[in-house]
Each structure stands twice: as C-alpha cells, then as structure tokens.
From Swiss-Prot:
GO CC list: plasma membrane
Site (described: Cleavage (non-hydrolytic)): 189-190
NCBIfam families: PRK05305.1-1 (NF003677), PRK05305.1-2 (NF003678), PRK05305.1-3 (NF003679), PRK05305.2-5 (NF003685)
Subcellular location(s) of the protein: Cell membrane
Pfam families recorded: PS_Dcarbxylase
Main location: membrane
PTM characteristics: Is synthesized initially as an inactive proenzyme. Formation of the active enzyme involves a self-maturation process in which the active site pyruvoyl group is generated from an internal serine residue via an autocatalytic post-translational modification. Two non-identical subunits are generated from the proenzyme in this reaction, and the pyruvate is formed at the N-terminus of the alpha chain, which is derived from the carboxyl end of the proenzyme.
EC number: 4.1.1.65
Annotated active site: 190 (schiff-base intermediate with substrate)
Name assigned to this protein: Phosphatidylserine decarboxylase proenzyme
Essential cofactor(s): pyruvate
One Gene Ontology molecular-function label: phosphatidylserine decarboxylase activity
Catalyzed reactions per annotation: a 1,2-diacyl-sn-glycero-3-phospho-L-serine + H(+) = a 1,2-diacyl-sn-glycero-3-phosphoethanolamine + CO2
Organism of provenance: Mesorhizobium japonicum (strain LMG 29417 / CECT 9101 / MAFF 303099)
C-alpha cells in the first residue's frame, strides 16, 4: 500500500448532506470563540460530533443473492412477522420484518439490503414518535423502497424519529440498485425496517449490533426456522 493510500484510508469520508451542518457549526464556533474560549471549545466539540455523525465509511458487502444485508448501522430492535405499510402496495399479508434502530452516534447513511429493480418509492408524511416504538412503523413519517430482487419482493422503509425529521432518498423508481449500495440518509437518530418474504430465514437477534452493508440480516434458501433469540 502506498503512502497516499495509507493517508487516504486514515480519514473517513464525509457525506455531502453533512456539509451545510458542518460549515454552520464551524462558523458558529469561530464567532463564539471571539467572545469566549469556553464557548469556542464547546462549539469545536459540537463541530467534531457533526463531522462524526455524517461520516460515510466504505463497507465490504458480501456478494451473494441469497443474503440480505443490513440497511444501516444500529441495533436490531425487532425480528418477526408484520404487515408492511399500506402505501407500499404489498397487500395485507404478513412478511418478515427486521428493524434496525439508529441512535445519534450511528452512521446514518442507508444502504440497499438486496440487489434488484426499484419498483416503487413512496414517501408518507406522519408523526415523529420515538422510532423504537413498534407503532412508529405505521404512524411516523417514512419513505419506502420496494425492490424486486432475484428472490422476491423486498422493502426497505426509512422511518423518522423524535429528533430525525429529515429523510433523504436519492434512489429513483425504475432504476436498479446493488446490494449494499447507498440510497439515502436519515438525520439524527431513526430506524430502517426491512420487509422480506416469509421464505427468508432471519440470521440476527434482537439486541445485536448491525453494520450497514455488511451484517447479514437474513438468508434465502436457508434452513427454515423461527427467528434467533439472544443468548447472553
């Protein structure tokens, strides 16, 4: 590895969505620093946190159509059957839902859980309840992607939370997307639900830490069974 590559790998990329926030924090820090050194250091800490929040690291995604990867960094908050949001047009039939909760320290860039064609993108206004609540999946503001994958229809739903009130999605309906490919971002704490056909076997447990684009959430063609339980 060259010296240039070593230096490059030492710095985590920052997503462009964070540039305005980082610039505002930096400018505010300089302004406050003119009046108080204490305020300057507090502003510097806030700016550093903002840089950390909008980090966009590269991820190593397993290349296998049977695998479903996590759409976000966070904690697995739910694994089990659930009816997908009505606006996705997937009917009133239960699918396997795996929820990933992101706190304010998580990387908030969202990635596709599978590869395929984006059949539909639907944004729905709503409330801003705590994203950890189960009813947040149907009552909160959200943005859903319906993906026609090689193993059936899969949906990824970005859900706003108490603090996160800005959902960003740059994917387009009708286009194709790869497993682990970036498609959006949610600012300042939120959740992403993945809805899968019941033929998919969950490979994670509630409470487990997930890494977006890398952690395998479920597998198609695996041995049938109930969702994993956490064993301490």
């Amino acid at each position: 590895m060259s010296l240039v590559d070593t230096v490059k790998n030492a710095f985590v990329p920052i997503h462009r969505e964070g540039y305005p926030f980082i610039a505002a924090c930096g400018a505010g820090t300089l302004f406050l620093g003119y009046f108080s050194s204490v305020l300057f250091w507090l502003g510097l800490i806030l700016t550093a946190w903002c840089v950390y929040f909008f980090r966009d690291p590269e991820r190593v995604t397993p290349v296998d159509d049977r695998l479903v990867v996590s759409p976000a960094d966070g904690i697995i908050s739910a694994v089990g059957p659930a009816v997908p949001p009505r606006e996705l047009g997937l009917g009133n039939v239960e699918m396997t839902r795996i929820s990933v909760f992101m706190n304010v320290f998580s990387c908030h860039v969202n990635r596709s859980p599978v590869r395929g064609r984006i059949a539909k993108i639907e944004h729905r206004p709503g409330k801003f309840l705590n994203a950890e609540l189960d009813k947040a999946s149907t009552e909160n503001e959200r943005n859903g992607l319906v993906i026609e994958s090689p193993n059936g229809t899969v949906a990824a739903v970005q859900i706003a939370g108490l603090v996160a009130r800005r959902i960003v999605c740059w994917a387009e309906a009708g286009g194709s997307i790869g497993t682990g490919e970036r498609f959006g971002l949610i600012r300042f704490g939120s959740r992403v639900d993945v809805f899968l056909p019941l033929t998919a076997t969950p490979r994670v447990a509630v409470g487990q830490t997930a890494v977006g684009g890398e952690t395998v959430l479920a597998e198609f063609g695996g041995v049938a069974g109930t969702p994993l339980v956490r064993i301490s």
